[in-house]
Amino acid sequence: MPSPAPLSAPRSPISREADAFVRTKIVATMGPASRTEEAIRGLVEAGVDVFRLNMAHGSIPEHEETLGRIRSVSAELERPVAVLVDLAGPKIRLGELPDGLVECVEGAEITFVRGEESDRADRFVTNYPPLVDELAVGDAVMIADGTVSLVVESKTSDEARCRVVQPGPIRSRQGVNLPGVKLSVPAMSQTDWQHAEWAAAAGADFVSLSFVRSPVEVTLLEQLLRTRGSRARVIAKIEKREAVDNLEAIVEAAGGVMVARGDLGVETDVASMPMVQKRIIRVCQQFQKPVIVATQ
């Protein structure tokens, strides 16, 4: 009588966790210090699966050179790695401030005005001309990743007067978030369209769309990529309240999703951020779409 086959030992929790990690990929953002072949090789050997090219910084020739090095190292090490081209999108930023820095004191009045620059510390300009038109009394204005907050107290056709609620220092070109304010700005600027066309021609594997608000925006980018012969997946970055409200439709339309915790944490209540993140991940699992959790 043959002896029974030996029972396999139960898999340890460590083994199960290791398998789960293999299914979890690492996305690394390229920067000036990591663009050399030596640095890229070290990152690939350390386990990077996807390299992100941030189109908000650098020129197309610089990114093209970096992408070429990534492909070269990938072939040399015989390890496939993907490239994600991240479009900048309509990020609202402050213009130039006097001396580059302003200390916002609690209770102080700050006025947003039209124009490209200001010579007064209490008068701010931005790169978004319709801002004054689209703000309303009572709206919150968050600056520098939400570390400084203002509230709109009054407005005219040419300016919006705000009161500092949460004080702190701000610098030129820092980001401005308007939680709950519906903006008329398109999802992609002319520069974004040019970058998307370059991504298609360069053979990018993923193209991410910033500040998505509706599935229509995702579809438009996908159509552009397909007409250029690209099979790149569109990654919808969830960082606006409107995107959370339209989450299921956006996830269904996209090739994948990024939980962009930085801007999303400012646009939503920070205390609810963990639950919002879990909801996004759960919906992506329901639609069997990859999901990236990124930034602070």
Report the location of each language-model feature.
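Non-catalytic helical/linker scaffolds that mediate oligomerization, partner binding
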Residues: M1-T295
